[in-house]
């Protein structure tokens, strides 16, 4: 450790080891080194009275050095020496013992009076709070010259005459040279105050030297942490930080250290001129900014520039760089800028305004004078009505100065406005023993550093609760320890933990105590251990020192001379904005940064653009982060427009440029000062219910009341000097862009001088804490706010480390989260949505996806609200995005089947179109995806479980169990179903009435609905539920529970009935067209006459029975011959009710062929497999039958059966895993009796028993094989099987027709599943009984 001891301008560096030495020992070492520095022998007499710290405070002789000073600190010695050297080079031995020819005694010999005043034993300087508050640092004279010791001490005070200090008359008593002395009061009999301040005290008697500095009751060191010196030390530190000290010695090096003869001794009276301005209500045309000294003190308002053609320029009232120090009765010095502006506005109400101005030529001297005088300028000296003496003193016996008044010749008045106490009663008539000088401007080792331990700050007691994320801050120490220890500082605040949640601890705070344990002498490791010893959920108490920095106002252009009309003045008193239109107010906030340095201002900003020309409209506050500095300040609001930040204007800049300016200014200037200055424009509330929290109420605001220190309301004209608001062509151009008529941010068209864009016309009713959040400070994203507001996504308020997300209260006022370009930084990083699937844009993407269930929003809502709804997924929700192979489908179905029962009730989904489809196929069915399908329980809409045929047929003619059954509509026509028919008729009648009623109401909706029905007609066949009325009513109750309002329920019900009525018409017509097309295709493929020869009579009978076209005479003859052979009467031809023009047949066939092209990747052997449909021939067959049926044929049939079993194992596993329907109805009984009377041949029976077709047995009765099986899975399977069937049919068509009668077994024509299906589905009028299958 080492310190620097300053003996005047001579500095001595003294090594101190570990700092465990006393101050007394330090003085001894410093004196020894000083003697060597000035080349004096060891007998040279030097007495050090005390040591003062460079930052203030007196060091006690018994203090341990490391306790009162830090490493490399600078100490000032107050000392006396035997022979002041007057020109000798202190570093050269050749000047040893030499003196300047102008000896000190010669001055005394030529003058009858001395330049020093006698020293009195009772004139010890007394340190009092008044002296300290008066910014009067203490200094002690050096009167140890031996040539003066013989002077008499009885010299009368009246005989004193002072002389100006000069090189001929050096004044070595000063601790630091080269600074002007304080203008203090002198003797009452002295008329010239310039001479009063030059009194010096005579040296004391050598016999009293030992008694000069003693510790007694009247003497005590003043601790640096004493509250009385807080204010004085802060001001002193500001001066020290702004003062540059010349460390080089004047030439010659050993010359006397005073140069006051080069500096004129002037006062503020000589510099100030009085300007009288009559108040005619017009603007002065000046732009003013705060004028601050280097130490941070505000010295007034500086005239930055004059408006061309303005009043100030025309009447020559002001000039550029003039400094206004006083307006009327208000002193503008040492005032914050907002306070000065408030005083300015108050002065505008007077008829005549008196400006006290320091001209630009004297500005430099005025700034230097301000270093010596804190407030010596009399407040009422140039007041127009100051015609009386205003004696200001705190003691009756305090001497009064009689200054001159050169301007208006007012009576003299006391100059020193600071209080001063007399030293004693009997010495009150004498001049002060030591005139006060300027504070010693000794630079500290860390000038401007907030971490200087000697700078007294604020004591804070902070309690932190340790959570799972720890205390949340890190500590550091100095590199060079002092006495084995070093002060502990908070290094930074972590983004998570107790510190940032509490918000009070700040980076740079010095830790004094932890849980009552003093950290003095503790190392950093010990402090860390002490902090870590805190238990989880425990509380740690921290005592910290924080250095308070004075706010340095940035230079801002303003026009405070803008005159207000009486109406506007009244409006200001009533807390209304100052702009003439009365729609907006300009607020300036001094927002202290959050105690955690990383939190920043804590706002999210947005850049708005014009909807018409896309011009940038400015930067606005989008949201205020809960827990940030702006949120704690509580005055900034959402939709406030940022005009300037830390004096940097954001107007007239592009949004991106303004964002960069904002980010740069807040990250550098805000962190440096610990405070961010914001100028915002806010639309005024109509009812004043949203008054700024920091603004005082209107009735309680007197004229003299100053606004809050952190808030000021300023007219727009005050900030017209800011870029974009300047009264210039450039400014008008910028405002013309801002004031463009924009629907986003409508404003009233007003003069450009008083207009600033406000973002929204709606009232900002949300408090600052109800806002969006983010985990970064002052983050921004240039979003574009939509005109239609949408509700925010609901989010849970989080108590995490950063902050919480709160939804907007009013959805009308909330901006649209799905707006173009809208995503905050917090959403990009943390995705803090409560449920992303509930967001509108997510739903939109889902509903438009080719691979997702139709209309997720509707289905999810109904499923979630349906009581007892099963949660197991079936079908496409199994995870099959694209079920292009039977293997993936079979595996998924098998897994679900093994896991448990499949739910019975499911909403009818749309088909997944994940397989490869060309555009024509997609165009045919894509309209079915416009709206969600009606739920299976709604109004008796048919489900796959209850009517396999009706719901499973698609435009591509699926090969499924439904192919084995006759259509339900045909069965209903042949069978007759009065109950179902009556219900259908009632539905149709009701739907007809509803159509007339709702035709105009649902005109727009019908467009989408018609498209849906058209597409569904090609894909599905619809029918009526076979459920009873009870199940139908239960379905209605369930769907009603899923809607919240009666209106929605009625609308949905009417819509469903209308859709059902239309879909029934489509179903009946399409069923007829489909059956006709299928029969025609079968007839063209095989031919009834060919099948008669080898396929069995029942097959041919079925072919004729289902044929819907007129028969030729040849066909009729063959039919009669066939019936004659089997000895069965032939029934009449079936009715023509099923006849229909095959209008859609060609289109359906074309779509099938196109779809099959994408799936022709099966094994070649599968395509060549053949099937045996051989039957046992009855004995009544003609003798011409060929004898090709032999043993070899039997062997070949068995081989084919084995191949079929192996090739269709996948289909077997799939269908075998499905539950089978065990019950039978009338149709199954009739089918059994038919099979008993007419048993098929061996080949046909083997084909039916083939594992490939074994699944057909379980669904022959009109019911799906497994109850509750999902329709989508069945349709997927049907499509895959149907593709294979169609490929084989096409291959069969390509075979050349063979002439003649073929045998029962054919190798060249592979049978297809449709043959078995048609054989099994054929009906006959035998015995007058209808055929059921």
Curated annotation (Swiss-Prot):
Residues 1176-1199 have a biased composition (Low complexity). Residues 143-262, 369-388, 397-441, 861-884, 928-1011, 1024-1071, 1110-1267, 1283-1333 are annotated as: Disordered. Pfam families: Par3_HAL_N_term, PDZ. One of its GO terms (cellular component) is cell junction. The keyword Ubl conjugation does not apply. The modification N6-acetyllysine is found at residues 831, 848, 881, 1327. It is found in: Cytoplasm; Endomembrane system; Cell junction; Cell junction, Tight junction. Belongs to the PAR3 family. Interacts with PRCKI and CDH5. Interacts (via PDZ 3 domain) with PTEN (via C-terminus). Component of a complex whose core is composed of ARHGAP17, AMOT, PALS1, PATJ and PARD3/PAR3. Interacts with LIMK2, AURKA and AURKB. Component of the Par polarity complex, composed of at least phosphorylated PRKCZ, PARD3 and TIAM1. Interacts with ECT2 and FBF1. Interacts (via PDZ 1 domain) with F11R/JAM1, PARD6A and PARD6B. Part of a complex with PARD6A or PARD6B, PRKCI or PRKCZ and CDC42 or RAC1. Directly interacts with TIAM1 and TIAM2. Interacts with SIRT2. Interacts (via coiled-coil domain) with FRMD4A. This is Partitioning defective 3 homolog. The lineage of its organism: Eukaryota, Metazoa, Chordata, Craniata, Vertebrata. The gene is Pard3.
């Amino acid at each position: 450790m080492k310190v620097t001891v300053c003996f005047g301008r001579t500095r001595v560096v003294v090594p101190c080891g570990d700092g465990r030495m006393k101050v007394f020992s330090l003085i001894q070492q410093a004196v020894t080194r000083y003697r060597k520095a000035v080349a004096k022998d060891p007998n040279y007499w030097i007495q050090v009275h005390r040591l003062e710290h460079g930052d203030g405070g007196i060091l006690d002789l018994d203090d341990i050095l490391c306790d009162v000073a830090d490493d490399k600190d600078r100490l000032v010695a107050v000392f006396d020496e035997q022979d002041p050297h007057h020109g000798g080079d202190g570093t050269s031995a050749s000047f040893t013992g030499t003196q300047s020819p102008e000896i000190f005694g010669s001055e005394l010999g030529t003058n009858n009076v001395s330049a020093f005043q006698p020293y009195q034993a009772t004139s010890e300087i007394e340190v009092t709070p008044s002296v300290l508050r008066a910014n009067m640092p203490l200094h002690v004279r050096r009167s140890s010259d031996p040539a003066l010791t013989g002077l008499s001490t009885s010299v009368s005070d009246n005989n004193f005459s002072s002389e100006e200090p000069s090189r001929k008359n050096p004044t070595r008593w000063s601790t630091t040279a080269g600074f002007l002395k304080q203008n203090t009061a002198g003797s009452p009999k002295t008329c010239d105050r310039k001479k009063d301040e030059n009194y010096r005290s005579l040296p004391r008697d050598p016999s009293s030297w030992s008694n000069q500095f003693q510790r007694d009751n009247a003497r005590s060191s003043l601790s640096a942490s004493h509250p009385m010196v807080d204010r004085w030390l802060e001001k002193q530190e500001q001066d020290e930080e702004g003062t540059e000290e010349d460390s080089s010695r004047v030439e010659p090096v050993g010359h006397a250290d005073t140069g006051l003869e080069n500096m004129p001794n002037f006062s503020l009276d000589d510099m100030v001129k009085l300007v009288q301005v009559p108040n005619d209500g017009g603007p002065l045309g000046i732009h003013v900014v705060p004028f601050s000294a280097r130490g941070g003190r505000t010295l007034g308002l500086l005239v930055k520039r004059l408006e061309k053609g303005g009043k100030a320029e025309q009447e020559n009232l002001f000039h550029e760089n003039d400094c206004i120090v006083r307006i009327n009765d208000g002193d503008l010095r040492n005032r914050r800028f907002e306070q000065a502006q408030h005083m300015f506005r108050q002065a505008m109400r007077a008829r005549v305004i008196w400006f006290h101005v320091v001209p630009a030529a004297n500005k430099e001297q005025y700034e230097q004078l301000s270093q010596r005088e804190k407030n010596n300028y009399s407040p009422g000296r140039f007041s127009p009505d100051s015609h009386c003496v205003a004696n200001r003193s705190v003691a009756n016996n305090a001497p009064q100065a009689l200054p001159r008044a050169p301007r208006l010749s007012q009576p003299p008045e006391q100059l020193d406005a600071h209080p001063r106490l007399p030293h004693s009663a009997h010495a009150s008539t004498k001049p002060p023993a030591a005139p006060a000088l300027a504070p010693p401007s000794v630079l500290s080792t860390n000038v401007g550093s907030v971490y200087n331990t000697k700078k007294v700050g604020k004591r804070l007691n902070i309690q932190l609760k340790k959570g799972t994320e720890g205390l949340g801050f890190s500590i550091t120490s100095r590199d060079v320890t002092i006495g084995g220890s070093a002060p502990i500082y908070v290094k930074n605040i972590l983004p998570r933990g107790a510190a940032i949640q509490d918000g009070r601890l700040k980076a740079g705070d010095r830790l004094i105590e932890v849980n009552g344990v003093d950290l003095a002498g503790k190392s950093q490791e010990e402090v860390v251990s002490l902090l870590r010893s805190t238990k989880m959920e425990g509380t740690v108490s921290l005592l910290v020192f924080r250095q308070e920095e004075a706010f340095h106002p940035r230079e801002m252009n303003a026009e405070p001379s803008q005159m207000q009309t009486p109406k506007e003045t009244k409006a200001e008193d009533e807390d209304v904005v100052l702009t003439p239109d009365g729609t907006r107010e300009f607020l300036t906030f001094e927002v202290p940064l959050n105690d955690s340095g990383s939190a920043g201002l804590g706002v999210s900003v947005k850049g708005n653009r014009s909807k018409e020309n896309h011009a940038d409209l400015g930067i606005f506050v989008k949201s205020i982060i809960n827990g940030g500095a702006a949120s704690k300040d509580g005055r900034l609001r959402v939709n406030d427009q940022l005009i300037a930040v830390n004096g940097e204007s954001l107007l007239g800049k592009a949004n991106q440029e303004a964002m960069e300016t904002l980010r740069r200014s807040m990250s550098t200037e805000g962190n440096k000062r610990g405070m961010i200055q914001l100028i915002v424009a806010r639309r005024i509330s109509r009812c004043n219910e949203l008054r700024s929290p920091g603004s005082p109420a209107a009735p309680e605001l007197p004229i003299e009341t100053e606004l809050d220190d952190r808030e000021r309301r300023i007219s727009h004209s005050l900030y017209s000097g800011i870029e974009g608001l300047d009264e210039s062509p450039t400014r008008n151009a910028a405002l013309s862009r801002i004031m463009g008529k924009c629907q986003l941010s409508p404003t009233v068209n007003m003069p450009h001088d008083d207009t600033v864009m406000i973002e929204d016309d709606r009232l900002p009713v949300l408090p600052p804490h109800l806002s969006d959040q983010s985990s970064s400070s002052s983050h921004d994203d240039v979003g574009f706010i939509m005109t239609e507001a949408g509700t925010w996504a609901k989010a849970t308020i989080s108590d995490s480390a950063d902050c919480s997300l709160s939804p907007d209260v009013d959805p009308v006022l909330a901006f649209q989260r799905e707006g173009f370009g809208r995503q905050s930084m917090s959403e990009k990083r943390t995705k803090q949505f409560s449920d992303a699937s509930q967001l509108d844009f997510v739903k939109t993407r889902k509903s438009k996806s080719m691979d997702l269930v139709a209309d997720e929003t509707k289905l999810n809502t109904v499923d979630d609200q349906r009581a007892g709804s099963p949660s197991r997924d079936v079908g496409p929700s199994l995870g099959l995005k694209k079920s292009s192979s039977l293997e993936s489908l079979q595996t998924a179905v098998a897994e679900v089947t093994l896991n448990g029962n499949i739910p019975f009730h499911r909403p009818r989904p749309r088909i997944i179109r994940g397989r490869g489809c060309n555009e024509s196929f997609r165009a045919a069915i894509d309209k079915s995806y416009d709206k969600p399908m009606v739920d299976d329980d709604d109004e008796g809409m048919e489900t796959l479980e209850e009517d396999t045929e009706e719901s499973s047929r698609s435009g591509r003619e699926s090969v499924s169990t439904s192919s084995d059954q006759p259509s339900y509509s045909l069965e209903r026509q042949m069978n007759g179903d009065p109950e179902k028919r009556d219900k259908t008729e009632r539905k149709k009648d009701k739907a007809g009435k509803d159509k007339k009623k709702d035709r105009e109401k649902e005109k727009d909706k019908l467009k989408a609905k018609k498209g849906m029905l058209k597409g569904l007609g090609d894909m599905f066949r619809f029918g009526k539920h076979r459920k009873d009325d009870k199940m139908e009513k239960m379905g209605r109750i369930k769907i009603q529970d899923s809607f919240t309002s009666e209106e929605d329920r009625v609308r949905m019900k009417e819509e469903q009935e209308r859709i059902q009525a239309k879909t029934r018409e489509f179903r009946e017509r399409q069923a007829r067209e489909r059956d006709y097309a299928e029969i025609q295709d079968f007839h063209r493929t095989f031919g009834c006459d060919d099948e008669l020869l080898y396929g069995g009579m029942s097959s041919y009978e079925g072919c004729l029975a289902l044929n819907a076209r007129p028969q030729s005479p040849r066909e009729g003859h063959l039919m009669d011959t066939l019936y004659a052979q089997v000895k069965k009467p032939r029934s009449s031809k079936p009715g023509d009710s099923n006849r229909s023009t095959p209008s859609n047949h060609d289109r359906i066939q074309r779509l099938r062929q196109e779809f099959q092209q994408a799936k022709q990747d099966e094994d070649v052997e599968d395509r060549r497999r053949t099937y045996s449909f051989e039957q046992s021939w009855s004995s009544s067959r003609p003798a011409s039958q060929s004898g090709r049926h032999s043993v070899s044929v039997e062997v070949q049939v068995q081989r084919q059966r084995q191949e079929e079993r192996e090739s269709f194992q996948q289909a077997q596993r799939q269908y075998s895993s499905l539950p089978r329907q065990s019950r039978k109805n009338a149709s199954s009984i009739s089918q059994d009796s038919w099979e008993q009377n007419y048993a098929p041949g061996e080949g046909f029976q083997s084909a039916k028993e083939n594992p490939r077709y074994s699944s057909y047995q379980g669904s022959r009765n009109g019911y799906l094989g497994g109850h509750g099986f999902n329709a989508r899975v069945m349709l997927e399977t049907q499509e895959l099987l149907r593709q294979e069937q169609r490929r084989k049919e096409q291959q069969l068509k390509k075979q050349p027709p063979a002439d003649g009668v073929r045998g029962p077994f054919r190798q060249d024509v592979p049978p297809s599943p449709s043959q078995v299906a048609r054989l099994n589905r054929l009906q006959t009028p035998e015995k007058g009984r209808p055929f059921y299958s």
